[in-house]
Amino acid sequence: MCDELTEIDNESFSNGGGALSRRDFSKLSAAAIMSLMFPTNALGQEVVEKSDVMVNMRDGVSDCYYVRPSSGKHPAVLMWPDIKGLRPAFRAMGKRLAMQGYSVLVVNPFYRDAKAPVVGEGASFSDPETRKFLIAMARKLTQNASMADARAYIEFLDAQDNVDTNRKVGTLGYCMGGPLIMRTAGAVPNRVGAAASFHGGGLVSDADDSPHLLIPSSSAHVLHAIAENDDERGPDAKNV
């Protein structure tokens, strides 16, 4: 579950001087998951091209980061950041994945309200004003809105010359991105073949639009990487 306590846990862990930070773990995990789900892709260190792009959406224009190998056609990956949005850490994660042979679009989920980065370097979710600001934007990511966004992002990817549209799309989500990968898989089931969430929150609820209810609409292979504190706060979710 991705809530204010979890985010504070994340910051404490990342600042604790461990040998492997959550950021580094996520970078390694993302590459590993995509490699397993698309096993025929080479595990080389591709030379990449990167650019800031504007994607036309139903509700406006989304500023995104697009990074891909400098030659050839490659499977597409749609990356949803955590609640602090598109920022240098996620640009680095997208680049790392692109170096493994993927065309990666890292999106600004809050484009309706602000261009990325939506918070400054070092902003803490434990700060009340920062938390209030981010949560207000996150609440606008309803199922209807986020599924429309997913369709637009994948339409953008499929229109790129360096995307292999004969290969399925992968999607990754971090923290609040957990529900977004499920909605992506449900919104474009014929294109999304792999989905993974890390520390995802709000995957299961009693609401009529709970993300887990979209599972029958998806044909993707899915991995949810759940931490111990996630399970402690929502022990029944795994049994749904």
Q: For each predicted feature, which ranges?
A:
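Short amphipathic alpha-helix adjacent to the substrate-entry channel of hydrolases
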Residues: 88-107, 111-112, 117
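N-terminal export leaders
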Residues: 20-35
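N-terminal cap/lid segment of alpha/beta-hydrolase-fold proteins
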Residues: 42-72
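N-terminal secretory signal peptides
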Residues: 1-20
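Primarily recognizes the serine-hydrolase "nucleophile elbow" in alpha/beta-hydrolase
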Residues: 151-214
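The feature captures the conserved acid-bearing segment of alpha/beta-hydrolase catalytic domains
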Residues: 202-240
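Gly/Ser-rich "nucleophile elbow"/oxyanion-hole loop immediately N-terminal to the catalytic nucleophile
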Residues: 123-170
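Short beta-strand element of the alpha/beta-hydrolase
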Residues: 74-82
